[in-house]
Swiss-Prot record:
Protein EC: 2.7.7.89, 2.7.7.42
TM region positions: none
Family that this chain belongs to: Belongs to the GlnE family.
Cofactor: Mg(2+)
Enzyme class: transferase
Functional summary from the UniProt entry: Involved in the regulation of glutamine synthetase GlnA, a key enzyme in the process to assimilate ammonia. When cellular nitrogen levels are high, the C-terminal adenylyl transferase (AT) inactivates GlnA by covalent transfer of an adenylyl group from ATP to specific tyrosine residue of GlnA, thus reducing its activity. Conversely, when nitrogen levels are low, the N-terminal adenylyl removase (AR) activates GlnA by removing the adenylyl group by phosphorolysis, increasing its activity.
Lineage start: Bacteria, Pseudomonadati, Pseudomonadota, Alphaproteobacteria, Hyphomicrobiales
Region (Adenylyl removase): 1-474
Protein name, UniProt field: Bifunctional glutamine synthetase adenylyltransferase/adenylyl-removing enzyme
Top-level taxon: Bacteria
Origin species: Rhodopseudomonas palustris (strain ATCC BAA-98 / CGA009)
Length: 990
């Protein structure tokens, strides 16, 4: 009776009745138990109603259980309001969404307080997000209807918030609108939706990209009101209403950084300034961005007029060489972003990875830029519509249109499903096979392999079409006649040729080439090498011309040649492998640290031609195996140390090169740096133990362990990280003297051993040093012994250590020790970290430490990513503070890695989700940029003097359109992080 009563009023338009075959269950038993467990906690009438719908519609039941299993975000929406779930399932989704928007507009129109508006918009977002997700998961709406619904939701939310703010300003007498109910009309305030929002293609957890402009002679402004402060204040209010994190969530994250020069301009710009900027300084990527621009709120008439004025900037009537070169440069920059990453499944980024969504969008937008000036029909916003018109006008084949369209729809669906898991703006697939197995089921596949087959097929087809976009030589240089590269700076034909390739200093390059071709360097004295090199020079010059700074690349290669004693094999390698040469050019141009390493040890290039180079990063087991091979036949202790240094430098070079080329995520690189260091530390530990014992013998019952602290402990190392180490030992008290020819007493033995260990790392040989070692984190720092006995270490941590030492201990990790001794040390550390603490005392100590660091290091330099206010130190302190305060009652919070500790704190409810969604992306941004800066900059980073190649690599690492946008993002991020630090820990003047 209950079942029939509940379902009798449903018709076939109801969302519940329209579910088709959707997700599959990864663990059906666990999923069913989780769903049933939630139902059991509900009021009986609610539980019965939801259960009846599930029983009546089996596909719906599986989808709901799949959400419980795979999507914490959607399951939270469901659990947060069972009545909302019933309301969504029982109605027709098209009518329900329209009613939601209508009701919200009615409520906001009557609201008198900003808090009421914020609450109403968040209620709207929560129900609409659940409804749209269910329509996507259940196959009720095709993917582009889903994106349009998300776009409509965003656009109406922006308009509602803006209308409220302008109504408030009208009430204060600052504007006099002709229509008080629609105060935006005739206001001269223009809100442009950019990117996917502009094209009606918004993804599930997307930021909304907006640019706000205003007319200087805004007709509705009161006479005494200055336009800029007024419109900036309104824009800030708009951003606050939409994106401020509260207990009831947020509406949309707002990104205002696509405006002209965002690092130095206010959040709202006059149309006069905008037009002047686009005319004088507008870049090709900004032209591409404007293809999708659409007035979405504010004065729509003024918005359309502004786009008409901007149109000549976007749509050029004639395609000159410079424009074509810009388009080609956009493609090169994107290739640099992707590096040479293989198409993959685990961890693949379906937006910017090979064969991804960005390549489809770029494929369409590039040809729109090229032809849209003469063919107005190409001036459309949606990607699929552009592909359709390009095919109809024979710019692309019907096959290209069909394959790219099908791939786009598939990849957008995958992207949505990834984002539904945790409502994060991510585009990367899970990075383990097990996680992909579960994700595949959530997407409706029966296995990881069946999903992988489809995914790889689409990615490969997209990549194939994308690769053909600039088939041949777009600059026309291949058609130039051959020249004499050794003719010198007097040969005008050579100079013209170098200019045509893009060199800015042809006289200097011609002089360098003349030196090469006459065999003036040691490496070129051998006739066969010189002959091979001469044949190779034209290809070399053409390839180096593709570098970001071609003249600097030639100079760097020249330094490499001068440093070589014997280089025939290197010349041969580069002549036969153009991809290798491109990579070497990037290294030489952007990372002097790596370039110097290459000049000293050219044999490290061998690693770049290993097929494994562009595959997965080697794990610890593989690194250990490689290290064992490197050391296998070393004959002496000194040779062991030399080979260790060579192994370390080659590993650093290979990881650094992968960071530069964009072929490994920087977080994986950080782990790889740590794995290399850990493998070397373990090897040195064993080697020094044996070598030391041969002279001094051993102490009865002796055990030694190396405790990694800092970046090695947390596995967050960079190319320039030193090793923060503590040596811990123990032995039998009844026989404290060693049994060697030169006997030492207990503590003296281990102190001498530790000094020998440090020397093995820091002694400079022909191959440099292994690592700088810092032992100041040991008990009592420099004043204490260099090695600590375990009981003394435990007593110090328990009775004497300062709060900062316990903060540092959250990163402590035993990396070399016998298993039983390792366990004893870990027990000591865990006991210290999980003891009960006074939160107020810890917060005060942390705030005081932050103030002291600010006084010593300063915190005003935005690009000091570690120490700036709101920088990485703030995030580290937050993670460490949460661990010390909460580990007593929630020991699962503990983790040596900052991001993992934040994840644990969020999962355990000890860090608000809203704060986590600021801190985690901030930490990733800082780590991404820090990896680049540690590779490429030895002194303080100054963007005003940095080379364009470095700036481009940083822009790529920060996933920004240009450096100005990146700088604006860093500033905004630091402000947000500092606000959280001040709220959680205090010390607003920290």
């Amino acid at each position: 009776m209950i079942f029939s009563a509940i379902t009798a009023d449903l018709d076939n338009t109801a969302l519940a009745a329209r579910f088709g075959a959707g997700p599959r269950l990864y663990d059906p038993v666990l999923a069913a138990e989780r769903w049933a467990g939630w139902l059991a906690d509900l009021a009986p009438e609610q539980a019965d109603a939801i259960a009846a719908l599930g029983n009546a519609f089996p596909d719906l039941q599986i989808a709901l259980q799949s959400i419980a299993e795979a999507s914490p975000y959607l399951f939270d929406l469901i659990r947060g309001d069972p009545v909302r779930l019933l309301r969504v399932l029982r109605g027709a989704p098209e009518q329900r969404l329209a009613k939601l928007l209508e009701d919200a507009e009615t409520f906001v129109a009557a609201a008198s307080a900003e808090d009421e508006v914020m609450a109403a918009l968040r209620r709207l977002k929560a129900e609409a997000a659940l409804l749209i997700a269910l329509c996507d998961i259940g196959g009720i709406w095709p993917v582009m209807q889903v994106t349009q619904a998300l776009t409509d939701l965003a656009g109406r939310s922006v308009q509602m918030a803006l209308r409220f703010l302008l109504r408030q300003e009208a009430g204060r007498g600052r504007i006099v609108p002709p229509n008080p109910d629609c105060p935006e009309q005739g206001s001269g305030l223009i809100v442009l939706a950019m990117g996917k929002m502009g094209a009606g293609e918004l993804n599930y957890s997307s930021d909304i990209d907006l640019i706000v402009f205003y007319e200087l002679d805004a007709p509705t402004l009161a006479p005494d009101i200055e336009p800029q402060p007024f419109f900036v204040r309104v824009t800030q209010g708009l951003s606050r209403i939409l994106q401020q994190r509260r207990g009831d969530g947020y509406v949309f994250r707002v990104d205002l950084r696509l405006r002209p020069d965002p690092a130095s301009t206010p959040v709202a710009l006059s149309t006069v300034s905008a037009l002047d900027y686009y005319e004088r300084e507008g870049r090709t990527w900004e032209r591409a961005a404007m293809i999708k621009a659409r007035p979405c709120a504010g004065d729509l008439v003024a918005g359309d007029a502004l786009l008409s004025e901007i149109a000549p900037f976007v749509w050029r009537k004639h395609l000159d060489f410079a424009a074509l070169s810009d388009v080609h440069d956009m493609k090169r920059q994107m290739q640099t972003y992707r590096g040479q990453t293989e198409i993959a499944v685990e961890g693949h980024n379906v937006k910017v990875g090979r064969g991804g969504i960005r390549e489809i969008e770029f494929f369409a937008q590039t040809q729109q830029l090229i032809a849209g000036g003469r063919h107005p029909e190409l001036r459309v916003r949606p990607t699929l519509e552009a592909l359709e018109i390009l095919a109809a006008r024979n710019w692309i084949t019907l096959q290209a249109r069909d394959e790219l369209t099908e791939a786009y729809l598939f990849l957008r669906k995958v992207e949505h499903r990834v984002q539904m898991i945790a409502d994060e703006q991510t585009h990367a697939l899970p990075d383990t096979v097990e996680a992909i197995e579960q994700f595949s089921r959530f997407l409706g596949y029966d296995s990881r392999d069946s999903f992988a087959r489809d995914l790889l097929g689409y990615l490969e087809r997209v990549q194939g079409h994308y690769a053909k976009l600039f088939e041949g030589d777009p600059t026309g240089t291949a058609k130039l006649p051959p020249v004499d590269y050794g003719a010198g700076p007097e040969d005008t034909r050579l100079l013209d040729h170098l200019l045509s390739l893009g060199y800015k200093k042809p006289l200097m390059i011609a002089t360098t080439l003349q030196q090469w071709m006459t065999g003036g360097y040691r490496v070129l004295k051998v006739e066969t090498t010189q002959r091979a090199f001469r044949e190779f020079v034209p290809a070399l010059i053409e390839e180096l011309a593709r570098a970001e700074q071609p003249d600097d690349a030639v100079n760097a290669f020249d330094r490499l040649l001068q440093a070589l004693h014997r280089g025939g094999r290197l010349i041969s390698l580069l002549s036969q492998n153009r991809e290798l040469l491109t990579l070497v050019a990037l290294v030489l141009g952007a990372a002097p640290r790596l370039g110097d390493m290459l000049a000293r040890q050219p044999q490290i290039l061998d690693g770049l031609i290993d097929p494994r180079f562009f595959g997965a990063m080697p794990d610890q087991a593989e690194l250990s195996a490689r290290l064992a091979v490197t050391l296998a036949d070393a004959g002496s202790y000194e040779e062991f140390l030399d080979r260790l240094r060579l192994f370390g430098q080659e590993s650093l070079f290979l990881i650094g090169t992968r960071i530069l080329s964009g072929t490994v995520p920087t977080q994986q690189a950080a782990v790889a740096f740590a794995d290399v260091a850990e493998g070397i530390v373990g090897t040195v530990h064993g080697l020094v133990s044996e070598q030391f014992a041969s002279t001094y013998g051993r102490v009865k019952g002796q055990q030694t362990a190396i405790l990694a602290m800092g970046k090695l402990g947390s596995r967050e190392m960079t190319a320039s990280s030193d090793l923060d180490l503590i040596l811990i030992y123990d032995f039998d008290d009844d026989q404290p003297d060693s049994d060697g020819e030169r006997s030492l007493h207990g503590a003296q033995y281990f102190a001498r051993f530790t000094q020998r260990l440090i020397s093995a790392f820091t002694t400079r040989t022909n191959y440099g040093v292994l690592y700088d070692v810092d032992m100041r984190l040991r008990p009592s720092g420099r004043a204490g012994p260099v090695a600590s006995r375990l009981d003394a270490f435990a007593a110090y941590q328990e009775q004497e250590a300062w709060t900062w030492e316990h903060l540092a201990l959250t990163r402590a990790r035993v990396i070399s020790a016998p298993p039983e001794f390792r366990s004893r040390i870990e027990q000591v550390i865990r006991a210290v970290l999980t003891r009960q603490r006074d939160a107020a005392i810890i917060a005060n100590d942390v705030a005081e430490m932050r103030r002291a660091i600010a006084q010593e290091k300063g915190e005003d330099d935005v690009w000091d990513l570690k120490y700036a206010a709101g920088g990485m130190v703030d995030i580290d302190f937050i993670a460490q503070y949460l661990q010390l305060v909460h580990a007593h009652e929630a020991p699962d919070i503990l983790h040596v890695n900052t991001l993992s500790a934040l994840d644990n704190a969020t999962r355990l409810g000890l860090l608000a989700q809203a704060d986590a969604e600021v801190l985690r992306p901030a930490a990733r941004l800082y780590q991404n940029l820090t990896q680049i800066l540690r590779l490429c900059v030895s002194e303080k980073f100054n963007p005003d003097t940095a080379g364009d190649d470095l700036l481009r690599v940083m822009v790529r690492a920060g996933d920004a359109p240009d450096f100005s946008s990146l700088q604006a993002r860093v500033k905004e991020t630091q402000s947000d992080v500092r606000a959280i630090f001040s709220r959680l820990i205090g010390g607003e003047d920290a």
